[in-house]
């Protein structure tokens, strides 16, 4: 990559000076002062100031001068990220990487907070500590993946959102809303279109010959999991068993045996690939052939989906696009807090493998 254009380089210097508090009294440099400071012409000085206006750090008032905006007076150049899944879901590694890169390209540093923990009580304590730490350190905005798999997760997530809102810190939600559908929280959201994803997977199962479809899930999951469940049910509408939700652990031999006997499914959609991989092992122990006896599908397309026997049919999440979009949305919110609430729902691609279509037929499809 070549050397940055001069005006961008000098704008970056002034941006950092603002965030250090060098202009804390509120007044900022005029065009003439920028020209003298850097020994540049008026056109370049105007471009520098326009960059800072675009960042939301300064305002220019005709006849009055140039001043720091409210954001400029309090800017830290830091964005906080709170995720719950890095130690048990590889899906968020590329998302977090893209978030970090996008922050860096936009002139922000990233404060990373991973609240994953096997202990439910510790997970809640950890995320609440992170909230206070971010507020103490000073952040311009926060990207928050709502916590799940804990009792009263919705209440905890709403408490976290209210804390940031009360402190005047913009918040963008990652992957899931904090409100249960069909309700919508007052916060920006970036995720895949979970309902459409569930519906598309269900349509594939129908086309593969399934007529009795089960959606295997757990309690205390994020609202997005319920959206997937709803999508599967909509896609299975009219079938003898139209996407019935079953709450069970995929490696619970007795529970899966009861489900097979009671519901007689010929297809099982799991809320993610790891759960589907565990289910494949359980079905093998119960003597069920996949996909001949039962078709199995997951969501996310993490590495294990390609390594299972048979490989898993799944829905691939656009991780890099998610990461880049959530940073873009947050920076826009930081610069303009009065924007209307936005939901960016991204597309997800169906990846067909041998857990739903026999190898001989799959070759004909490719």
Give the role of each language-model region:
Residues 1-40, 46-50, 119-120, 129-136, ...:
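Extreme N-terminal segment that seeds HTH/winged-HTH DNA-binding domains in transcriptional regulators
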Residues 8, 12-13, 20, 72-144, ...:
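Amphipathic helical "hinge" segments at domain boundaries
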Residues 17, 186-187, 257-366:
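Flexible loop/turn connectors
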Residues 27-28, 55-63, 67-69:
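Beta-hairpin "wing" of winged helix-turn-helix
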Residues 80-82, 138-149, 170-172, 214-217, ...:
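Periplasmic-binding protein-like
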Residues 147-197, 274, 300-312:
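Flexible loop/hinge segments that line or gate small-molecule binding clefts
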Residues 177-180, 184-215, 251-257, 276, ...:
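Hydrophobic alpha-helical segments within soluble ligand-binding/sensing domains
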Residues 199-239, 342-356:
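An alpha-beta-alpha
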């Amino acid at each position: 990559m070549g050397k940055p254009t001069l005006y961008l380089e000098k704008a970056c210097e002034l941006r950092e000076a603002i965030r250090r508090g060098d202009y804390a009294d509120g007044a900022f440099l005029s065009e003439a002062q920028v020209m003298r400071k850097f020994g540049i012409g008026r056109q370049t000085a105007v471009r520098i100031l326009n960059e800072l206006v675009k960042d939301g750090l300064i305002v220019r008032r005709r006849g009055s001068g140039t001043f720091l905006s409210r954001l400029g007076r309090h800017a830290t150049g830091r964005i906080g990220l709170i995720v719950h899944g890095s130690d048990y879901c590889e899906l968020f590694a590329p998302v977090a990487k893209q978030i970090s890169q996008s922050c860096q390209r936009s002139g922000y540093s990233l404060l990373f907070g991973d609240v994953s923990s096997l202990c439910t009580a510790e997970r809640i304590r950890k995320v609440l500590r992170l909230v206070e730490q971010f507020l103490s350190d000073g952040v311009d905005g926060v990207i928050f993946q709502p916590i799940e798999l804990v009792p009263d997760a919705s209440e905890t997530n709403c408490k976290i959102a209210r804390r940031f809102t009360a402190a005047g810190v913009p918040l963008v939600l990652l992957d899931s809303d904090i409100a249960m559908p069909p309700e919508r929280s007052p916060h920006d959201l970036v995720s895949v279109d979970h309902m459409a994803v569930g519906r598309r997977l269900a349509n594939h199962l129908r086309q593969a010959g399934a007529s009795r479809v089960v959606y295997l899930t757990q309690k205390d999951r994020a609202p997005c999991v319920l959206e997937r469940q709803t999508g599967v049910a909509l896609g299975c509408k009219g079938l003898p068993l139209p996407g019935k939700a079953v709450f069970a652990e995929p490696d619970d031999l007795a529970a899966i045996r009861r489900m097979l006997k009671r519901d007689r499914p010929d297809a099982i959609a799991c809320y993610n690939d790891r759960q589907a991989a565990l289910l494949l092992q359980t079905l093998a122990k119960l003597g069920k052939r996949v996909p001949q006896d039962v078709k199995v599908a997951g969501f996310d397309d993490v590495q294990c989906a390609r390594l299972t026997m048979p490989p898993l049919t799944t829905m691939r999440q656009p991780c890099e696009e998610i990461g880049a979009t959530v940073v873009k949305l947050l920076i826009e919110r930081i610069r303009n807090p009065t924007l209307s609430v936005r939901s960016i729902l991204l597309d997800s691609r169906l990846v067909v493998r041998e857990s739903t279509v026999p190898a001989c037929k799959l070759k004909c499809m490719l």
